[in-house]
């Protein structure tokens, strides 16, 4: 597969959709697009003039707490969808220019038509750069899930210092696969690369987020819409 571009999709309860758009637009240095969808449940976060092409979208979901997923932009959605199915994915929904699929480990993702996006947006100091979707995967499904995403995207794997992580590197949005300690249902969250995590944490708190816990090289945060995400010690 030739992935031309990728989007981090922020999924939040529909009732919190406005709060999610406002917060993440501020985090990413962007403005919210006109709403799309039958209920106005989709929005793109468009970087301000000269800030690059969009790579973040927001969706209001009807059931559950939401989370995140990745959209892969390709030139041939039907062809790449068929290839994903051959690798073990399951087709959930399709229409012209869109295929919604489920990975072997249960993660939803989308293939969408590439619209010529190529300019990677810059980081917002000190908020960091939203550049990663982390797929939280049960131990029994983890190895096969890593193999699936590596084969699907063709993105190079970068060694990680901790064995529970596998990174598939790309821009503007890359994939981190995390092996969970228990057989929990699959989930996904957003990661931001932060040059100074303590400073970024203070910025996010001032913007309305709440710290949840600190890890070795990350801080788990809760956004104003109730979604979890991480600030991580990486160069933005």
Write out the residue ranges for each language-model feature.
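N-terminal beta-strand motif that seeds the catalytic metal site of vicinal oxygen chelate
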Residues: 1-21, 68, 72, 112-147, ...
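Conserved short beta-strand elements that form part of the metal-binding/catalytic scaffold
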Residues: 28-66, 104-115, 155-188, 222-224, ...
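Vicinal oxygen chelate
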Residues: 17, 65-105, 189-228, 233
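Core segments of cupin and vicinal oxygen chelate
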Residues: 1-53, 79-80, 86, 92-94, ...
């Amino acid at each position: 597969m030739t992935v031309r571009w990728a989007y981090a999709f922020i999924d939040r309860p529909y009732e919190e959709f406005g709060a999610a758009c406002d917060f993440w637009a501020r985090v990413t240095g962007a403005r919210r697009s006109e709403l799309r969808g039958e209920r106005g449940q989709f929005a793109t976060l468009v970087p301000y003039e000269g800030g690059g092409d969009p790579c973040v979208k927001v969706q209001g979901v009807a059931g559950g707490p939401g989370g995140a997923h990745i959209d892969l932009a390709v030139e041939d959605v039907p062809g790449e969808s068929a290839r994903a199915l051959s690798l073990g994915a399951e087709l959930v929904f399709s229409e012209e220019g869109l295929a919604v699929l489920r990975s072997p480990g249960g993660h939803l993702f989308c293939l969408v038509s590439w619209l010529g996006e190529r300019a990677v947006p810059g980081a917002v100091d000190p908020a960091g750069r939203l550049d990663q979707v982390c797929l939280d995967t049960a131990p029994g499904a983890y190895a096969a899930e890593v193999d699936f995403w590596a084969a699907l995207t063709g993105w190079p794997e970068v060694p990680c210092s901790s064995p529970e992580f596998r990174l598939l590197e790309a821009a503007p949005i890359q994939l981190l696969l995390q092996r969970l300690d228990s057989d929990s249902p699959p989930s996904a969250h957003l990661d931001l690369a932060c040059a100074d995590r303590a400073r970024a944490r203070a910025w996010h708190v001032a913007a309305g987020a709440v710290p949840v816990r600190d890890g070795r090289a990350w801080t788990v945060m809760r956004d104003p819409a109730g979604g979890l995400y991480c600030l991580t010690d990486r160069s933005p």
